[in-house]
Amino acid sequence: MDFLFNTNAQFFIAAYLIGAIPFGLLLAKKYAGVDVKSSGSGSIGATNVLRVVKQSNPALAKKLGAATLLLDALKGVLVLLFAYFYGVSEATLWGISVLAVLGHCYSPYLGFEGGKGVATGMGVMMFMLPLETIIALVVWALGAKFIRISSLSSLTALGALIVASFILHPDMAHAPVIIIGFVLLYKHIPNIIRLFKGEEKRVV
């Protein structure tokens, strides 16, 4: 158990456990009285919170969706900030980033189920690769405006971020970016299937 006293290990554990907090599920249950895991797409993320709560309270849906998006984005950044000011290596920061996303997508509080990782991934990437993330957010915003399908906008933005990271930082180790990208892509497989079938719902 000596590894638990290792600083890096402590940050890794914190990143996973904090990343695993299902803010969307908690907020929707407390303030709207709905279980997003058994409604809509079953995801705990901001999009499903907005979609499910909107059916009964559109004004509240926007507030809870925004709060979920913000909290999911910040939960990985919080640990990164502590670790950064503690002086850990860049490799450790990337490890924290990956584990925060894994925590959100495979939460031990939810039987290792979870969300799709978009907001949490966006948060850690904004910290680690800010310019690439800004490019991805612009792509996402354009997709949201013209396509109006959340999953397709997110996947397009993910692709833009990965490509931008190779162009702007060709010499960096891209393994963490690829891992996060793969996890997000894997979690979106049901959405991709619905896209091909023309069944994916739009979120306005």
Swiss-Prot record:
It is a multi-pass membrane protein. One of its GO terms (biological process) is phospholipid biosynthetic process. InterPro entries: G3P_acylTferase_PlsY. It is an enzyme of class 2 (transferase). The keyword Hydrolase does not apply. Probably interacts with PlsX. NCBIfam families: glycerol-3-phosphate 1-O-acyltransferase PlsY. Catalyzes the transfer of an acyl group from acyl-phosphate (acyl-PO(4)) to glycerol-3-phosphate (G3P) to form lysophosphatidic acid (LPA). This enzyme utilizes acyl-phosphate as fatty acyl donor, but not acyl-CoA or acyl-ACP. Belongs to the PlsY family. This is Glycerol-3-phosphate acyltransferase.
